[in-house]
Regions:
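HEAT/HEAT-like alpha-solenoid repeats
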Residues: 33, 94, 203, 207, ...
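Long, hydrophobic, well-ordered secondary-structure blocks that form the structural core
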Residues: 137-145
Length: 333
């Protein structure tokens, strides 16, 4: 047992670390408050590479605000960001409580179909915040393949049949299935008869080590682990027994991987080391821009289709979530 001096030193070290985490969270939140658009949208950009190098162009989307409203819900300092993101999500909601990926700020947003991913994330975030959402459960569970997995797209051929046909000829396929999107559907709908095929498939993919073969749109195993963990931690704790050893052995390749890895460890009850994430924070309170997702990777394609999508604000959102979860674990230890 440590003596009194050692105990006081340990307490002092823990207090100092806690103060540094608090400061990093406040700086990150301040950056996000500045970056968040007047509409409440969290900005994201399109670039030719996963490193988001070269020319970048703004890409108005619903997705990042939905992610932020969920990820930052446990960060008291970010309450205003979450409220503004929820306001934005409510304005972007289409009939029946459905959403599409591009926001109405994008001139050709009607080209894109409604989708399961944005609908599940936005619905979960709004309901957790006590905001009203129409009963969209039936609309989501209809969008499943014969094997029970959720499709990416909520296909409505009318009132824009030519635009919809163009989208599915050049951009995507009506029967696209991505298990990260299934994870977000499970997170929203919970453990029920309609989601059990998706739960079983996620577990099978984890056991087989097939994470990157399970996603069309996302660019990192760390990202897959993060979204799977949000979906499965309360439903299938055995998933943590698979994810945690792999996560401990993996070396994050960039700030986004580092943030999602730290958050995922905390989701499964670990106390992550916050130091690498603290060290990666920049002087303006942000973390570096890294591509989170891309235009899709088909089975026979050696590389994902460009562009990639990411932003300093998006990485910072994940980092603030990670540090908040780390702080919570340290306080309860």
């Amino acid at each position: 047992m440590p003596n009194g001096i050692e105990s006081r030193e340990a307490e002092g070290t823990a207090a100092e670390e806690g103060n540094r985490i608090d400061l990093a969270i406040r700086r990150g939140v301040t950056f996000l408050e500045t970056a968040q658009l007047p509409s409440g949208e969290i900005p994201i950009e399109a670039a030719a590479t996963a490193e988001m190098s070269g020319e970048r162009a703004p890409e108005p989307v619903v997705f990042c605000a939905a992610l932020a409203a969920r990820a930052l819900a446990g960060t008291p300092e970010a309450a205003r960001i979450c409220a503004r993101a929820c306001d934005f999500l409510q304005r972007e909601m289409r009939r029946g409580g459905l959403w599409r990926h591009p926001s109405t700020a994008k001139p050709d947003h009607v080209y894109a179909p409604l989708d399961v991913d944005d609908t599940a994330l936005a619905s979960a975030a709004l309901r957790a915040a006590g905001r009203p959402v129409p009963n969209n459960r039936r609309a989501l569970v209809r969008e499943r393949e014969p094997d029970g997995l959720f499709r990416t797209w909520i296909v409505r051929w009318w009132p824009h049949p030519f635009l919809t046909r163009h989208f599915f000829k050049y951009v995507a396929e009506p029967h696209d299935v991505d298990l990260v999107i299934n994870a977000n559907a499970v997170f929203y709908l919970g453990d029920c008869e309609e989601t059990r095929p998706a739960i079983a498939r996620m577990l099978a993919v984890l056991r087989a080590g097939g994470e990157m073969e399970s996603t069309i749109w996302y660019g990192s195993t760390h990202t897959v682990w993060y979204f799977f963990s949000h979906a499965l931690r309360a439903i299938a704790p055995e998933a943590g027994e698979i994810v945690l050893p792999r996560l401990r052995a993996a070396v994050p390749g960039n700030a986004l991987d580092l943030a999602t890895a730290t958050a995922t460890l905390a989701l499964w009850g670990e106390i992550p080391d916050p130091e690498p994430l603290l060290a990666a924070q920049r002087s303006d309170g942000s973390w570096p821009n890294v591509g989170l997702y891309h235009m899709g990777r088909r089975r026979l394609e050696p590389q994902p289709r460009t562009p990639w999508f990411g932003s300093e604000a998006l990485t910072t959102m994940f980092a603030v979530e990670a540090l908040s979860r780390c702080r919570e674990r340290l306080r309860s230890a």
